[in-house]
Amino acid sequence: MEIPMGTQGCFSKSLLLSASILVLWMLQGSQAALYIQKIPEQPQKNQDLLLSVQGVPDTFQDFNWYLGEETYGGTRLFTYIPGIQRPQRDGSAMGQRDIVGFPNGSMLLRRAQPTDSGTYQVAITINSEWTMKAKTEVQVAEKNKELPSTHLPTNAGILAATIIGSLAAGALLISCIAYLLVTRNWRGQSHRLPAPRGQGSLSILCSAVSPVPSVTPSTWMATTEKPELGPAHDAGDNNIYEVMPSPVLLVSPISDTRSINPARPLPTPPHLQAEPENHQYQQDLLNPDPAPYCQLVPTS
């Protein structure tokens, strides 16, 4: 029994379609089984980053790593061909990066930098018709980027303690200075209190005792008339006065440096020594009592 030609054509087309669908499904399954694990997940600056490939078949021809969304020669980092003396061959995108490839398809990026961030893709060639691919996103952060927020309470506490301590020390210093000033002023006033009291008493005494101008010998030498003490001295006064010593000491003015020394009697004028009747009065006038004034007391 022969199969019609039209039926054979339809069967061939159906078989080809089924094979194509099976190949696509196998490719999708291979891509789904291959994935990249980042160690660590969030790398920081100057930290080593391992991109470990999971789901690699036991046998393969080679694998290529790319940095970027496109996979071509300009984005190729390196090609690794196992079984040869020098398996790793760097690509144009390697630059100054320090990358080491491993036979299982993984790669190690040493001392990662923020400029190394981007999309990393790996393509593993099983044969000329089958290539497995996987990709991952890598973001390299600045070193210790989150440390300030972590240590913020500690730094704030230290800052607050420093400020409070400085304020307390300043207040204590100001209090000590104020105490010393007050104590010094109080002691100075206590030492100065006796002086004003003594000066006050002296001023009271001096004000109570009126100063008597000192009599110099020249005044007595110039006097030639006899003193008249009696009723004839004042015609309108009938009282008789006598001289009595004052109980108050004589206080001479400070400006008068020629005051008479009470201990040294004045010389008696020659023309007054010949008159004995007025000798007593002349002696009283020539040698006055050291008193600020003479008290006159009326006698009967």
UniProtKB/Swiss-Prot annotation:
Subcellular location: Membrane
Major location category of this protein: membrane
Tissue-specific expression: Ubiquitous with highest expression in prostate, uterus, fetal brain, mammary gland, adrenal gland, skeletal muscle, small intestine, and kidney, and lower expression in lung, cerebellum, testis, liver, pancreas, bone marrow and ovary.
Annotated TM spans: 158-178
Cytoplasmic compartment spans: 179-300
Superkingdom assignment: Eukaryota
Induction / repression: Down-regulated by dexamethasone (in vitro).
Membrane topology per record: Single-pass type I membrane protein
Stretch forming the signal peptide: 1-32
Glycan attachment residues as annotated in the record: 104
Family statement: Belongs to the immunoglobulin superfamily. CEA family.
Protein name: Cell adhesion molecule CEACAM19
Organism in which the protein naturally occurs: Homo sapiens (Human)
Taxonomic path: Eukaryota, Metazoa, Chordata, Craniata, Vertebrata
